[in-house]
Amino acid sequence: MEKGVYIIGTSTDIGKTFISGLILKKLREEGRNAGYYKAVLSGAIKDKKGLIPLDCEEVMEISGLKESYENMVSYILENPYSPHLASEVEEVSISMEKIKKDYKSVRDKYDFILCEGSGGIVCPISFSEKKLMLEDIIKEFNLPIILVSNSGLGAINHTVLTVSYLRNLGLKVKGIILNKFNKSDIIHRDNKKIIKELTGVNNISTVPKIEDIEKYDLNELNEVLYGI
């Protein structure tokens, strides 16, 4: 298995943070020394102690990982905008060198790194000073991608287009996860079949709407992680 994966979504609010937490939980329960990293996080909540990155909180709560925010995220922004706009409004300069340095620190501490992207693949990280896209970070880290999509109407279009775009960039798609999958829904079942045929991606896992994480069988993720 690779030394890490990059989790991205077909769009924002698709559930990639929740999925990141599930994957990290599985890896850690298997005995892997697995950590989490996100280059830029926007939409943090401000309290008396500063900015609270909710994505990190969610991942730690699900996975059991205990880590400081500064070791998980390079840039924490308050406004719930695309990273390039949030950083511009908050007058924060995004540096690829800092991102590379922080990622190396996480990589030195953990054997496996689960990186989470910001939104979909066409996501500007910085635009006003020097243009930096999410794809640039993924290329720099040289990690395969797990793509998270919804399971309902629109999933075929969004997923196939994203996979095509990723391949045009020369990025490796390790697998696909269809989130909030309902086995009794004919649309969901058909979407999985058509997506597999149109993309040629064989490693597709499904995650249902989960009320109690402890009751979820993490082995359902084996296909996307291990191809079994």
Swiss-Prot record:
Superkingdom of origin organism: Bacteria
CDD domains: DTBS (cd03109)
Keyword Ligase: yes
Active site: K38
Signal peptide start-end: none
Enzyme class label: ligase
Pathway(s) this gene product operates in, as recorded in its UniProt entry: Cofactor biosynthesis; biotin biosynthesis; biotin from 7,8-diaminononanoate: step 1/2
Residues that, per the record, bind ATP: 13-18, 55, 116-119, 179-180, 208-210
GO molecular function: ATP binding; dethiobiotin synthase activity; magnesium ion binding
Residue ranges that the Swiss-Prot or TrEMBL entry lists as coiled coil: none
GO CC terms of this entry: cytosol
GO aspect biological process, one term: biotin biosynthetic process
Reaction catalysed by this enzyme: (7R,8S)-7,8-diammoniononanoate + CO2 + ATP = (4R,5S)-dethiobiotin + ADP + phosphate + 3 H(+)
Sequence positions that bind substrate: S42
E.C. no: 6.3.3.3
Record-listed Mg(2+) binding positions: T17, D55, E116
Localization: Cytoplasm
Pfam families from the UniProt entry: AAA_26
InterPro entries assigned: DTB_synth_BioD (IPR004472), P-loop_NTPase (IPR027417)
Keyword Magnesium: yes
Keywords: ATP-binding, Biotin biosynthesis, Cytoplasm, Ligase, Magnesium, Metal-binding, Nucleotide-binding
Function: Catalyzes a mechanistically unusual reaction, the ATP-dependent insertion of CO2 between the N7 and N8 nitrogen atoms of 7,8-diaminopelargonic acid (DAPA, also called 7,8-diammoniononanoate) to form a ureido ring.
NCBIfam families, per database record: bioD (TIGR00347)
UniProt record similarity statement: Belongs to the dethiobiotin synthetase family.
Subunit annotation: Homodimer.
Identification of the protein by name: ATP-dependent dethiobiotin synthetase BioD
Lineage: Bacteria, Bacillati, Bacillota, Clostridia, Eubacteriales
